[in-house]
From Swiss-Prot:
Dual methyltransferase. It catalyzes N-terminal methylation of target proteins via its C-terminus. It catalyzes dimethylation on lysine residues of target proteins via its N-terminus. GO terms for molecular function: protein-lysine N-methyltransferase activity. Belongs to the methyltransferase superfamily. The lineage of its organism: Eukaryota, Metazoa, Ecdysozoa, Arthropoda, Hexapoda. InterPro entries: Lys/N-term_MeTrsfase_sf (IPR051419), Methyltranfer_dom (IPR025714), SAM-dependent_MTases_sf (IPR029063). One of its GO terms (biological process) is methylation. It catalyses: L-lysyl-[protein] + S-adenosyl-L-methionine = N(6)-methyl-L-lysyl-[protein] + S-adenosyl-L-homocysteine + H(+); N(6)-methyl-L-lysyl-[protein] + S-adenosyl-L-methionine = N(6),N(6)-dimethyl-L-lysyl-[protein] + S-adenosyl-L-homocysteine + H(+); N-terminal glycyl-L-lysyl-L-glutamyl-[protein] + 3 S-adenosyl-L-methionine = N-terminal N,N,N-trimethyl-glycyl-L-lysyl-L-glutamyl-[protein] + 3 S-adenosyl-L-homocysteine + 3 H(+). Its EC number is 2.1.1.-. The keyword Methyltransferase applies. The keyword Lipid metabolism does not apply. This is eEF1A lysine and N-terminal methyltransferase homolog. Keywords: Methyltransferase, Multifunctional enzyme, Transferase. It comes from the Eukaryota.
Length: 673
């Protein structure tokens, strides 16, 4: 099975074509392949009984090889008398039935409907050298003559590189003239060219254009074939254009990668599809580092299913770190997509082999090593496919990672980010079937741990009385992992969670074992409206947490939405937490100017602001207080240290963990005002 490449890169294709033809000159037309590479397509669309017209035969051996394999009724024409004379002398004795005539293909003298096949190897490309009006007029006459001399049901079979203006012309002209149009990518020709021109990284894909003539067609018939796979049928010419263009663009990417090192530039990203499928089967990130002694040349790393969301595989910085540890100059990082079936790692390698080879540096002769985390492709089980009016399609999945079973909530609008994750434990019950249980002591998102320290600070250090319940507001529920942890670890906390999406509450209860009781309840409401109502009704909380993501992925700040940092909302929070309370938010910001603006807004409202930046993630936890004593980082560290140690004790006392949850000293060293 072949994989159809679709690149996300943009290139100036015209410059590339110009370089290709300038470099090769007259030898450019050797690129179209000989009989051996083309025979599969020739025998598929041309039969020995056909009356064949060879358009612009030149000195090509194609018609001779066809004659020798049983195609006897072949008429060759060429505008050059020298070429015709030479071919007659060469074939008179050995191929007596084959005809060679000097004739202009744009003004042929044959009667109407003389042939059942018109074969064109590169002649169209030679005629259509540019897109000037005079050239287009010549090409239009060429095709009118082909159709005039062709019987109904006959076929034009053209071997072409399909430059953009040629493709556009064919897609416009042929359907209008009642021709069924099929375009097939000739992988055999392309592979042979690469082998014959191993030192030349400048390559182009070759296509077979098959246009079948009908008296009339009620609707256009447009098809594309990738190699020897079944045809993909389209309803519009733009879809067929896109299929051809995607192959050409991918070739340009592969050529660029063969000719140059992209160290210091962005990664190159390529999706691999099965023909006729719109969703990718694989995504490949290609990254380079400068040549250095001791580095391997090139390797591919296959990410097991379910692991693609981890930082080291899902971010450019993480993949750079992976490349450093792999110790290769070029690394192709391959991720496997959900809703696809993969059997064994060896079969995945075999399926990827040609695509991975196409991305290699020029001149590479060594076998390409395949790296992974184990000997299989990983395990991913979809528990449910759902839809949210707010967040769109989502999945609940279980994956195996490092010997653990993890249950995840994934939004398909941003499917390389885990929205919620829980550790699933298997509970063995004597005489009964094993039961799965969510481990509430597992915090998948590291930022939840640092928010929990803040809650510990607000509910114990700030308010030491143990017999009084402290109120905590969490805006943003998701799968409920943070709320379940706080509820289990901090018995003094009375938690209110606000979630705008009712589907998320169902997901949290049914798949993440979220349970409401007298110390924990969920309100379905807009978080901003709820905050405003609390302020208006004089409702106070000891801790307020914003753990909300933005649905607009185009912005440089994905958490929280910018509306949550409006001065009016922050003023409401200031009043709600009172003199002793704490406000915490998870800030995820790639745009430094937006981050600065967010921090400035917080400083304008709150007397004391402190932050902790997670080492590998871009998450940053911001702590805000009204208490003047927190104006120094020393005071923050003193009380956060007490809170951190208290949280470690709490998780052990409640049997959520047997070890400390937080490295207190490390955490305190990175706290900043």
């Amino acid at each position: 099975m072949n994989l159809l490449p679709k690149t996300r890169e943009e290139f100036a294709q015209t410059d590339y074509w110009n370089e290709f033809f300038k470099k090769r000159g007259e030898k450019a037309f050797e690129w179209y392949g000989e009989y051996l590479e083309l025979c599969d397509q020739i025998h598929k669309y041309i039969k020995p009984a056909d009356r064949i017209l060879m358009l612009g035969c030149g000195n090509s051996k194609l018609s001779m090889d066809m004659y020798d394999t049983g195609f006897r009724d072949i008429t060759n024409i060429d505008i050059s008398p020298i070429a015709v004379k030479k071919m007659l002398e060469l074939n008179a004795k050995s191929r007596p039935e084959m005809k060679f005539l000097q004739m202009d293909a744009t003004a042929m003298t044959f009667p109407d409907e003389s042939f059942s096949v018109s074969l064109d190897k590169g002649t169209l490309d030679a005629l259509f050298a540019d897109d000037e009006p005079e050239t287009r007029a010549v090409v239009e006459n060429y095709f009118k003559e082909i159709l005039r001399t062709m019987r109904n049901g006959g076929r034009y079979v053209g071997i072409s590189l399909l430059q953009e203006h040629i493709l556009n012309f064919l897609l416009d002209f042929l359907p209008k003239h009642n021709c069924m149009l099929r375009i097939v990518h000739c992988l055999g020709v392309e592979q042979a060219n690469k082998e014959k021109n191993a030192d030349d990284a400048l390559t182009l894909p070759v296509f077979v254009v098959v246009a079948t003539k009908f008296k009339s067609l009620p609707m256009p018939v447009l098809e594309f074939g990738f190699g020897n796979d079944k045809m993909q049928r389209f309803t519009t010419v733009s879809e067929l254009n896109s299929a051809v263009s995607s192959v050409q663009k991918a070739a340009l990417v592969c050529n660029g990668l063969a000719r140059s090192n992209i160290a210091g530039h962005n990664e190159v990203i390529m999706d691999l599809h099965r023909p006729s499928e719109q969703t990718p089967r694989y995504t490949i990130h290609i990254l380079d580092k400068p040549p250095a002694r001791g580095l391997g040349k090139y390797a591919a790393f296959i990410v097991p299913q379910g692991r693609e969301v981890e930082w080291i595989f899902s971010t450019p910085a993480g993949r750079k770190k992976l490349q450093d540890s792999a110790n290769f100059q070029r690394l192709a990082v391959v991720t496997l997509h959900r809703d696809q079936v993969y059997s064994t790692l060896d079969e995945v390698k075999q399926e990827l082999a040609d695509s991975i080879k196409n991305l290699s540096p020029a001149g590479l002769t060594d076998q390409i090593p395949y790296l992974s985390l184990g000997s299989d492709v990983g395990k991913r089980e979809t528990l449910i496919c759902g839809f949210s009016k707010i967040s769109g399609d989502f999945r609940i999945e279980e994956v195996e990672a490092n010997g653990k079973t993890l249950r995840r909530l994934i939004f398909l609008s941003n499917q390389f980010v885990v929205q919620s994750e829980a550790l699933v434990k298997t509970v063995k019950i004597k005489g009964k079937k094993d039961r799965k249980k969510i481990d509430f002591g597992y915090l998948a998102c590291q930022h939840h741990l640092y928010m929990s320290v803040g809650v510990q600070l607000a509910t114990t250090v700030q308010h030491p009385k143990r017999d009084v319940e402290k109120d905590v507001l969490v805006v943003g529920l998701g799968g409920g992992g943070l709320c379940s942890f706080l509820h289990a670890a901090l018995p003094q906390a009375r938690i209110t969670a606000v979630e705008i999406d009712p589907i998320m509450l169902e997901v949290a209860e049914q798949y993440f074992e979220l349970k409401q009781d007298k110390r924990f309840h969920v309100v379905i409401d807009d978080g901003l409206d709820f905050v405003e109502r609390c302020r208006n009704e004089d409702i106070h909380f000891d801790a307020v947490l914003f753990d909300v993501d933005s649905k607009d992925l185009s912005l440089g700040m994905s958490c929280p939405p910018q509306s949550f940092l409006a001065t009016k909302i922050l003023q409401h929070i200031k009043e709600i937490i009172g003199p002793k309370g704490l406000f915490m938010l998870n800030l995820v910001c790639r745009d430094e100017s937006l981050r600065t603006e967010a921090l400035n807004n917080l400083h304008k409202v709150f007397p004391a602001v402190c932050s902790y930046k997670l080492e590998e993630d871009i998450n940053e936890i911001i702590y805000c207080a009204n208490d003047e004593k927190y104006k120094t980082v020393e005071q923050w560290k003193k009380n956060m240290g007490t809170a951190g140690r208290g949280l470690n004790s709490a998780v052990k006392e409640t049997k959520l963990a047997s070890e400390d949850a937080l490295e207190v000293a490390e955490f305190l060293s990175e706290l900043k005002i």
